[in-house]
Each structure stands twice: as structure tokens, then as C-alpha cells.
Amino acid sequence: MMNLKNIFLAALATVAVLLTPSCNGNEPANTPEDEKPADINLLFNTPEVVIPAEGGVVDVMVVTNAESWDFVNAISWAEVERTSEGISIYATENTSDSNRKGDILIIATTGKTVKERTISVEQVAAGGTTVGGNLTFECPVFEAFVLSSYDYNGDGVLSAEEAAVVTDLNLMLDETSEEEQEPITSLKGIKNFVNLVNLDCSGNLLTSLDLSGMEKLEYVDCSYNNITKIDVSGCKNLKWLYFYMNKATSVLLEGCNNLMFFQGWRNNLTSIDLSNKPELIYLDLMMNSLRDIKFENCPKLQVAALGSNNLISLNLKGLPSLYTLGCYDNNIASLDLSELANLEMLECYTNNIASLDLTANKKLKTLTCQNNLIAELKLGDNTAFTKIDCSSNRLSGEVDFSKFTALKTIGCGGNDLTSINVSACTALTALSCENTKVTALEVSALTALEELVANDCLISVMDCSNNRKLSKLHLQGNPLTSLVLASGQSIYDLKVDNYDVISYK
């Protein structure tokens, strides 16, 4: 069977024969050469060339009966060479966001007669559209997936019409699957899914993600990739963005005013502006490299998780709904919490805070502010406290917890405290006051107490006979002369320097 090239050559040969002057003796009278125009035939096997985004070489066959022919390359991004059968067009990868086009002019000459024809050349962008209107994709794995799922007419290409019906794309790499799966390395071409609402591309090998202008997107999960830059600007309906466990240094959010959930822990962000997001509810940027973050004037924000960064300050204005603030393990020197009337949990441990005023936070239940420089701690009249850990600070003198009757856990060790009043904390189950200057502890009313750690204090007499639920009691490093327990009282984890000081009643 003849191949296409042979068929093309045979057709041209036929044309050439038909155009050849007759040799039967009935030749027309000779015409002067300068008056006789040559009949030039100039044919290509294709007048339109499409080069894929990754680049490559395309050969075009040129057949002519002219005495000579040449070409003019008007394309700056492609190289053209003449071959024995025509021309060879070479282009490198198209890294731009749009298709690029150009023309090559073929000029055939016989005597004074010239014939010109143009070859149109187009190189598609990664994720662009071919001259036939079909969609292209940079990553062959991504392309194979969409073709297997959405090439409804089975022609081996994805049309714009086929892409338009897609609202959900689940591209998550499931490592638990028994079937072998290849990771997707690029989502260039995804913008062709103009009606996409939900996208899950987690667990792949993406290095960048450009979803800008995809106005119908509401949900994106691109976690567990290697993404350094995320662009969702112009995604005006985006509500959920999950991008944790990446390498992101930049997230573009312009126009995302409906954003509700923003979770991007363990990335490389150094700054970000989330201020004035009227619908934002949940913010999690733990374990980044943040030195600056703006999230003021977010009236619906309830949770801000910002631990393990490099923050030195926080602007907490315009956050009336905030009830959980985690800003531990930073370099923060002060916190103004005066506008956070609904705050219930504050985790600000391991910072450089010198004083903390909680008098405006009457709903606060959990406070962990250990490992700071706090010399002044104002707890106010809050009766909602269930946990306070202010250990390893610079507190001194007496601390009175007695009015916080709902307290279940207290940690105040590692301070210069001389007196701790917990006499009315009847719900208390755990008290840790080790390494202080406390000389006595009154715990007889604490019948719910299960753990008491008071190592390295100045306690000489201790009566725990009324604390029948105690399972842990540490009193090492004290000048203890008497420890009174109830008859039959058994403490599973009991540590004292001299067990002879124990008596029972």
C-alpha cells in the first residue's frame, strides 16, 4: 500500500505531466522569452503547522516545477532549515501563557516569474488550544486522566465543549491504591475547565499552581505537593483553600473576598495579607517562616493558628468573633487582646512577652503562656478558666487562683513565687508548682486532685490526707519533715527524698 508521501508525490507528478507542453508536433509558435510567463506549480504537504508546547521539529514537503525556490523565515522563535524534500521547522519549549504564531514565505522562481505561498506556523502554550479548537495539557499524566474521563466522543482529544461540562476534578494521588499511579507534575491547561467548582490535586508533584481567574472555583485542595507559588487571584467564589505541606513562598489572593477556610501549615511563607476578608472563618499558617501577617478586620474569623513562625507582633483589631488564638513559638514581645471579648483559648507560650493583660477576655477558658518573660499577669475576674499554665516566667510574690473555681489544671512552676492560693479551686485535678519559693500548700479542699508536682520548693509540711484521688505526688528537693496521708491511701507515683517522713491518719 502506498504511504501518504508517495500518494502526494504521485499526485504532483500527474499535475506536472498535465502542465508539460505537448511534443506531438503541433507545438504553438515560439513566443519571445521575455513575453512568456512561466506556469509555476508550488505545493506543500501542509500549509498549516502546529508545534506542541514542549517544542520539537516539524518537516514540511515542498514540491515545485520552478527552476529554484527559497524561503523567508519571519518567525523569531523558530529556526528553519532547508532539507532535501522541503524545510524543517524547529522550536524550543513555549513557556509563555499564550500560543505564538508566525509565517514562513516560500518563493519559487523561473526566469522572471515568481510565485509565493505562505506556511502558517503556530506553537501552542502549555495548556492552550490548538488551531482546531482542541485543548492541550503540559503534563501527559494529567492529559491521560482527562481524556480517559471526559473525552466523550472518543476522538482522542478534549474539546472545549467536553471540558465545559466538568465541575469536579479529583486528581488526588492515592498512595494506598493497589493500582500503580503516576504523579501529576503540571496542571497547565486546567483553565480550560471554565465551569470547574471543586479541585483536589493533593499528593502529586506540582511545583506551581495558577488558577487565577477561575471564577466558579469554590474548593481547592493542593496539599502535599512541592508548590512554591499559588495564584488564585480573581477566584471570586473561592471558599476553601488547603495547601499545607508544600514549599509555598507566595499565595496571591486578590479578589478572593468569599474565602472562608485558609489552611497552609508547613510552607515557606514570610509574609501574607489576609486583612479585610469578610467571610474568613478559619486561618492556619503554623510552621511557616512568617515575619509579617495581616488579618485584621475579618469580622467572622474564629480561629487563627500561627504557631512556630518568626512573628514579632500581631495586629488583633477588628476580630470580634475570634475565640482561638495560637501564636506560640514566635518572637512576639507584646499582645493587645483588649478587643477579643469572645476569646476562649490563648496559646502564646515560648515568646518574649513581658506582661499579659487578660482583664477584657472574660470568656477565656484555656491559657498557655509558659516560657515567656512575664513579670505581670492580669487575669481579671474571669470565672471561665479551666486551664492556666504560666510556668517558666518571671512572676514573683503571691499568685491567687482561688476565685477561678472552674480551674482543672494549673501550671505555675519555674517562677519566683512565694505563695500560691488554690484553696477554693475545688475542681482542680492537676497542680504543678515545682521550682518555686513556696513554703506551704493548702490542698485539703481539693478532693478532685489527681496530680501534684511540687519538686524543688521550700515545703516542710504537707498534708494530702484529704486528696484520696491522688495518683501522682512529687515532692523531691524540699526540706520535707512531714507528709501526712490518709490511712489506706495508695499513691501510684509517689516521689519524696525520705519516705520516713510519711505518716498516716
Residue spans for each PLM region:
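Bacterial Sec-dependent N-terminal signal peptides
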Residues: 2-6, 10, 14-48, 115-135
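Conserved hydrophobic beta-strand positions in leucine-rich repeat
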Residues: 169-172, 199-201, 218-222, 241-243, ...
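Consensus "Asn ladder" position of solenoid repeat domains
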Residues: 204, 225, 246, 267, ...
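N-terminal capping/linker segments that flank leucine-rich repeat
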Residues: 29-35, 49-50, 55-60, 77-79, ...
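Canonical leucine-rich repeat
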Residues: 187-190, 209-211, 230, 251, ...
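Leucine-rich repeat
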Residues: 193-195, 214-217, 235-238, 256-259, ...
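Surface-exposed binding patches on compact interaction domains or structured appendages
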Residues: 39-44, 57-90
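A short beta-strand micro-motif common to beta-rich folds, especially ectodomain repeats
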Residues: 97-112
